[in-house]
């Protein structure tokens, strides 16, 4: 653990929105008088009908979470219309294409017209308030238009990452019973086409077999690639928007009306539809964007995430646009045409604030400093990290090489369920420690709890819980409130359990140590082990599978699969079968779930009651089998010797 302390930089302190004194004062107010604090900050967005109630939350019993519940507003109005008078000609979105020679700037006025046209297309084809619309798009401006158009008319969007497979897309269409899909002919990533329309067609066929019928598919022409066409179902976006008005009145939405569903992996197989609502979410996304990134008007802000993840929702689209910021959307990848792409984009668009994932940083660090130092990066003022804990070595490289020791780093901890950043440094207020997310944001009350549920005070290790609500918190799992309660509120009564382990040091700083449940963090993206196991077992050669994580130099965690085969299947060439299983998992879930190691085993370590002892599998995957602990409860201890002998990760 790093003991180095980096004091607040004088330059950061000079112009900051929040210094340490203000942080301590506001934080105290936010936890001692949440109603007063959030009433004040709730007014940062515009309300059609002001709220009179602020906080109505209970983490016990049936778990109810309501913020600003009698207020009426509209997210699209707050992200666009309210800026038109003073910022109509300001650039809202800078779009940087996969090809380094293609970009586009969209002003707030142009954003208004594009969003209104798309909203009118949705209405024309029967989409109403409360309907679920699935968005399966690459990182193009139309992805933001689609989200904002749904918000404008009160439809609930479900964005599915364009790297997910047709099977994964179908599961998400079925779960929220979506009948309208927005996609593109193809996406482009790293110079290669991605067959989005083809994937969508396949997904719709799969959904139909589960009695969910998609009626309309709106197709954005991105590449002009050849696509098959469903007559009466498929619509070209460019043709549809040309025939509708560029004005659409925003639908008045109650603060607790749903805004979006975003699916995230859980420790059981089926992804959970995380439901976020309107008022509290936008207050929290816009407030965290302003204060965590110390955002000043006129700055260029770039979050490298994809809108298919929550980081893209909160910190590419909703947070920045609610604040009237200029937000950069990047279609490409960090290593195309080469590993200097990020820094060339920073120079090209004069980026001031840069927010990315440790995975990307580790990969770029490994490519050598010359890809960074050939760019000037002189406009950079602040750096951010998101998605997983950043190891101190990568932090130091980011600070020294990318930031030239002049940019504070905000190492942010939060989750899909949280809506916005929960634990983070504030650049003008917080001394930094490489690898630590430091202190809670306003209104956030972290608690460390041991496995028996005892709250740990002072310096401690434990399970990270949050003891009270904040406005950006998810409200339920879509269609399954029981699962919401069981997943987050049943382990430790009266508290939200994050699923992460954490350490608090002598300065009260928080250090996230990783997942404590059966969820992996791969390149900053969550994947449930049960999801990958289900994909493996659906292959005809596989009898049983167990999946664990292991330390990976680039991705943070790698995917290690233990597989027992059906009788007779072991006659196949093991290398060929491994390749086949890798492709099978990619097809079932998507490239993000590509297994790194597959070990064939005659059996898995199980207790006499049949429970797989994952602790043992994790140790073997980490090549640390000298400390396996008590194995006396195993039904067949001999299984372990075989696993050790044939491990795929021998150092």
Curated annotation (Swiss-Prot):
CoA binds at residues 189-192, 311, 335, 523, 586. Disulfide bonds: none annotated. GO terms for cellular component: cytosol. GO terms for molecular function: acetate-CoA ligase activity; AMP binding; ATP binding; metal ion binding. Keywords: Acetylation, ATP-binding, Ligase, Magnesium, Metal-binding, Nucleotide-binding. Acetylated. Deacetylation by the SIR2-homolog deacetylase activates the enzyme. Pfam families: ACAS_N, AMP-binding, AMP-binding_C. The modification N6-acetyllysine is found at residue 611. Its EC number is 6.2.1.1. Its cofactor is Mg(2+). GO terms for biological process: acetyl-CoA biosynthetic process from acetate. It catalyses: acetate + ATP + CoA = acetyl-CoA + AMP + diphosphate. InterPro entries: Ac_CoA_lig, ACAS_N, AMP-bd_C, AMP-bd_C_sf, AMP-binding_CS, AMP-dep_synth/lig_dom, ANL_N_sf. The keyword Electron transport does not apply. Gene3D superfamilies: 3.30.300.30, N-terminal domain of ligase-like. Mg(2+) binds at residues 537, 539, 542. ATP binds at residues 387-389, 411-416, 500, 515, 526. Catalyzes the conversion of acetate into acetyl-CoA (AcCoA), an essential intermediate at the junction of anabolic and catabolic pathways. AcsA undergoes a two-step reaction. In the first half reaction, AcsA combines acetate with ATP to form acetyl-adenylate (AcAMP) intermediate. In the second half reaction, it can then transfer the acetyl group from AcAMP to the sulfhydryl group of CoA, forming the product AcCoA. Belongs to the ATP-dependent AMP-binding enzyme family. HAMAP family: Ac_CoA_synth (MF_01123). This is Acetyl-coenzyme A synthetase. The lineage of its organism: Bacteria, Pseudomonadati, Pseudomonadota, Alphaproteobacteria, Hyphomicrobiales.
């Amino acid at each position: 653990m790093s003991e180095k302390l980096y004091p607040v930089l004088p330059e950061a302190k000079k112009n900051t929105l929040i210094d340490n004194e203000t942080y301590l004062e506001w934080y105290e107010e936010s936890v001692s008088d949440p109603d007063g604090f959030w009433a004040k900050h709730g007014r940062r967005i515009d309300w059609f009908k002001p709220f009179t109630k602020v906080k109505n939350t209970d983490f016990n019993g049936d778990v109810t979470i309501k913020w600003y519940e009698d207020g009426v507003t509209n997210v699209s109005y707050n992200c666009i219309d309210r800026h038109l008078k003073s910022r109509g000609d300001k650039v809202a979105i800078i779009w940087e294409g996969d090809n380094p020679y293609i970009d586009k700037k969209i002003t707030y006025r142009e954003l208004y017209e594009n969003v209104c046209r798309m909203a009118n297309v949705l209405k024309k084809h029967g989409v109403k308030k409360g309907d679920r619309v699935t968005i399966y798009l690459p990182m193009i401006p139309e992805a933001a238009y689609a989200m904002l158009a749904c918000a404008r008319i009160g439809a609930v969007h479900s964005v599915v990452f364009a790297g997910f497979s047709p099977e994964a897309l179908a599961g998400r269409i079925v779960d929220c019973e979506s009948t309208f899909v927005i996609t593109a002919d193809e996406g482009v990533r790293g110079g290669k086409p991605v067959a989005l329309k083809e994937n969508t067609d396949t997904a719709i066929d799969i959904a139909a077999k589960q009695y969910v019928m998609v009626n309309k598919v709106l197709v954005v022409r991105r590449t002009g690639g050849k696509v098959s066409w469903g007559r009466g179902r498929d619509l070209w976006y460019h043709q549809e928007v040309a025939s509708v008005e560029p004005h659409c009145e925003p639908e008045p939405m109650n603060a607790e009306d749903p805004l979006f569903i975003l699916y995230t992996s859980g420790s059981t197989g089926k992804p959970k539809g995380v439901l976020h609502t309107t008022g509290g979410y936008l207050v929290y996304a816009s407030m965290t964007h302003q204060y965590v990134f110390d955002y000043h008007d006129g700055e260029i802000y770039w979050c490298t995430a994809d809108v298919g993840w929550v980081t893209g929702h909160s910190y590419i689209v909703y947070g920045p646009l609610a604040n009237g910021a200029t937000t950069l959307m990047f279609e490409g990848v960090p290593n195309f045409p080469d590993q200097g792409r990020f820094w060339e984009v920073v120079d090209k668009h004069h980026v001031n604030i840069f927010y990315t994932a440790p995975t990307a940083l580790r990969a770029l660090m490994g490519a050598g400093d010359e890809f960074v130092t050939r760019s000037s990066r002189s406009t950079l003022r602040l750096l951010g990290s998101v998605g997983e804990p950043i190891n101190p070595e990568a932090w130091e490289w980011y600070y020294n090489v990318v930031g030239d020791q002049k940019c504070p780093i905000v190492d942010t901890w939060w989750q899909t369920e949280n809506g916005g950043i929960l634990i983070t440094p504030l650049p003008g207020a917080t001394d930094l420690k490489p690898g630590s997310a430091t202190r809670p944001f306003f209104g956030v009350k972290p608690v460390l709890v041991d496995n028996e549920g005892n709250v740990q005070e002072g310096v401690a290790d434990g399970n990270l819980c949050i003891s009270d609500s904040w406005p950006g918190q998810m409200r339920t799992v879509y269609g399954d409130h029981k699962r919401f309660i069981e997943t987050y509120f049943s382990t430790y009564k009266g508290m939200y359990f994050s699923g992460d382990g954490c350490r608090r040091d002598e300065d009260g700083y928080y250090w996230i140590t990783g997942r404590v449940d059966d969820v992996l963090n791969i390149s900053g993206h969550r994947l449930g082990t049960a999801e990958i196991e289900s994909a493996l077992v659906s292959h005809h050669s596989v009898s049983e599978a167990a999946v664990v994580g292991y330390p990976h130099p680039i991705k943070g965690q790698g995917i290690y699969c233990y597989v027992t085969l059906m009788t007779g299947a072991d006659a196949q060439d093991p290398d060929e079968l491994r390749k086949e299983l890798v492709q099978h998992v990619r097809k079932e879930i998507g490239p993000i779930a590509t297994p790194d190691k597959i070990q064939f085993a005659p059996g898995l370590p199980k207790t006499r009651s049949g429970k797989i002892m994952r602790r043992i599998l994790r140790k073997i995957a980490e090549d640390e089998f000298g400390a396996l602990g008590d194995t006396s409860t195993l039904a067949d201890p001999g299984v372990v010797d075989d696993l050790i002998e044939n491990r795929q990760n021998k150092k």
